[in-house]
Amino acid sequence: MQHSKNYRKAAAAIDRSKLYTPAEAVKLAKETTSVKFDATVEVAMRLGVDPRKADQMVRGTVNLPHGTGKTARVIVFAAGAKAEEAVAAGADEVGTDELVARIQGGWLDFDAAIATPDQMAKIGRIARILGPRGLMPNPKTGTVTMNVTKAVADIKGGKIAFRVDKHSNLHLIIGKASFSESQLVDNYAAVLDEILRAKPSAAKGKYLRKVTLTTTMGPGVPIDPNVVKNLRENSAEG
């Protein structure tokens, strides 16, 4: 794969033989972003789990203290009073059968889906579309609920869901390159806390195998997975 001159220059600033602290990695990621727009900052983790085994699945949600830098588009499957509640809460689209039909037709212009429990039978018809994309409402992530107001507010406020893929990897957005270093470290710390809390008891050996921080179209910065405390040490902004 051919990389741009800017990418190669950015990659040259990263010492591949070194594992950086989260504060160092954030600083380096911000310094090496070369795109002309506000790049997204993402953390990728390789976990020591076998997601093919039900007792080693890692999934959950995390509330990013500073949000993702993007207002999530949220749809809600609800009817009657709950539909009105969802509209009042700021949901981008609200409906039942018509929403299902649109998704069956290929529409996927949203970041999260919420449903009241009575709508789940209908949503089952699009589970094969939503599931692989991490968009299927689920009680474990608080997206199958009667409290649609709270669910919409949480997601709009920076709550994101995570789920390990079949290769034992996790990918989570922790903000934008325009965020301050301390904001990005705070968001990284929140993610790390939840990933560690979600460790399955059946997982054996080293849990956090590899952690990398990247910006859109930028090189990865390797983070020391053993640094899980005092994450803001050495941060230029405290």
UniProtKB/Swiss-Prot annotation:
InterPro entries: Ribosom_uL1_bac-type (IPR005878), Ribosomal_uL1 (IPR002143), Ribosomal_uL1-like (IPR023674), Ribosomal_uL1/biogenesis (IPR028364), Ribosomal_uL1_3-a/b-sand (IPR016095), Ribosomal_uL1_CS (IPR023673). Coiled coil: none annotated. Gene3D superfamilies: 3.30.190.20, 3.40.50.790. GO terms for biological process: regulation of translation; translation. Pfam families: Ribosomal_L1 (PF00687). Keywords: Repressor, Ribonucleoprotein, Ribosomal protein, RNA-binding, rRNA-binding, Translation regulation, tRNA-binding. GO terms for cellular component: large ribosomal subunit. GO terms for molecular function: rRNA binding; structural constituent of ribosome; tRNA binding. Signal peptide: none annotated. CDD domains: Ribosomal_L1. SUPFAM superfamilies: Ribosomal protein L1. Binds directly to 23S rRNA. The L1 stalk is quite mobile in the ribosome, and is involved in E site tRNA release. Protein L1 is also a translational repressor protein, it controls the translation of the L11 operon by binding to its mRNA. NCBIfam families: rplA_bact. Part of the 50S ribosomal subunit. Belongs to the universal ribosomal protein uL1 family. This is Large ribosomal subunit protein uL1. It comes from Salinispora tropica (strain ATCC BAA-916 / DSM 44818 / JCM 13857 / NBRC 105044 / CNB-440). The lineage of its organism: Bacteria, Bacillati, Actinomycetota, Actinomycetes, Micromonosporales. The gene is rplA.
